[in-house]
Regions:
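A glycine-/small-polar-enriched, mobile loop at the entrance of the PLP active site in fold-type I
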Residues: 1-44, 49
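Conserved PLP-enzyme active-site core in the AAT-like
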Residues: 25-29, 38, 43, 47-194
């Protein structure tokens, strides 16, 4: 009853002076969840799919080459979206239930001496198959190749239930969602750089 009664308050208008007082502390608290010190958190009023689209459209442009893998339903949807938005996808098509192919990513990035690949995409937790991918391993592949590509992570069903170390792992943009892992939909750091 105590929790129910605490929620029994009038709605706050999002344009009122009270609204920022309520929401601004959330941004700093969410940085702790993502284990990040730098960068920005954006609370985005959409599904995880809407946040993916916004992240892609605000950081990349049609014709940009990206490295992606497909190994489950949500990585499949992310690849489809990238292609619909005009990105040139270098695809590692993997058996469902396997995760991000780190060795293939490392090989492709090492061979990309001209740095044509602008972003590397990794699905952190593939809900459809229950597979968790090694995001730190993707960063190691980028670093070993001395590759400047941005690292995008789909963690819609991961953040809040799996470890996410944006700062330590050098994640440039992470999309999470409220439903699968109980956190607000957001996107974060460095996603507007480069």
């Amino acid at each position: 009853d105590e929790v129910r009664m605490a929620m029994n308050v009038p709605m706050i208008d999002m344009r009122s002076a009270e609204y920022p007082k309520l929401t601004l502390p959330i941004f700093e608290d969410l940085k702790k969840v993502f284990k990040m010190k730098d960068g920005r958190v954006f609370i985005f009023p959409s599904s995880g799919t809407g946040a993916w689209e916004s992240a892609i459209q605000n950081t990349l442009k049609p014709g940009d080459k990206v490295l992606m893998s497909r190994f489950g339903q949500f990585s499949l949807l992310w690849v489809d979206m990238a292609e619909r938005l005009g990105l040139k996808v270098e695809l590692c098509d993997e058996e469902w239930g396997t995760g991000v192919p780190l060795e293939k990513y490392a090989d492709i990035l090492a061979k990309d001496k001209a740095h044509e690949i602008k972003a590397v995409f990794a699905t952190h937790n593939e809900t459809a198959t229950g597979v968790t991918s090694d995001i730190a391993g993707v960063r190691k592949a980028l670093d070993a190749a001395k590759h400047p590509a941005l690292l995008f992570v789909d963690s819609v069903s991961g953040v809040g239930s799996l470890d996410m170390r944006m700062g330590e792992w050098g994640v440039d943009c992470c999309v999470s969602g409220s439903c699968p892992s109980s956190w607000p939909i957001l996107w974060s750091p460095g996603s507007c750089s480069g």
